[in-house]
Every structure is written in C-alpha cells, then in structure tokens.
Amino acid sequence: FLPAIVGAAGKFLPKIFCAISKKC
C-alpha cells in the first residue's frame, strides 16, 4: 500500500513543484 502512495507522490509532486517554482 505504501509503495503505491510513494510512487504516486513521486510522479505528482514534481509537477506541483514545477508549477509553483516555474522551473520545468
């Protein structure tokens, strides 16, 4: 269960960080 959450966060968080910092 946890690895799935970590995997999803690993894909999702970079997109959020990219959008906030605008460093894509």
Swiss-Prot record:
The chain's disulfide connectivity reads: C18-C24
Q: Is the Hydrolase keyword given for this protein?
A: no
Q: Which residues form a coiled coil?
A: none
Where does tissue-level expression of this protein occur? Answer: Expressed by the skin glands.
Quote a single Gene Ontology cellular component term.
extracellular region
Q: Cross-referenced Pfam families, in alphabetical order?
A: Antimicrobial_1
UniProt keywords, alphabetically: Amphibian defense peptide, Antibiotic, Antimicrobial, Disulfide bond, Secreted
A single Gene Ontology biological process assigned to it is: defense response to bacterium
The record's subcellular location field reads: Secreted
Q: Domain of life of the organism in this record? A: Eukaryota
* UniProt keyword annotation of Oxidoreductase present: no
Query: InterPro entries from the entry?
Result: Antimicrobial_frog_1
Function, in words: Antibacterial activity against Gram-negative bacterium E.coli.
Q: Which family does it belong to?
A: Belongs to the frog skin active peptide (FSAP) family. Brevinin subfamily.
Recorded protein name is Brevinin-1Sb
Q: What is the organism of origin for this protein?
A: Lithobates sphenocephalus
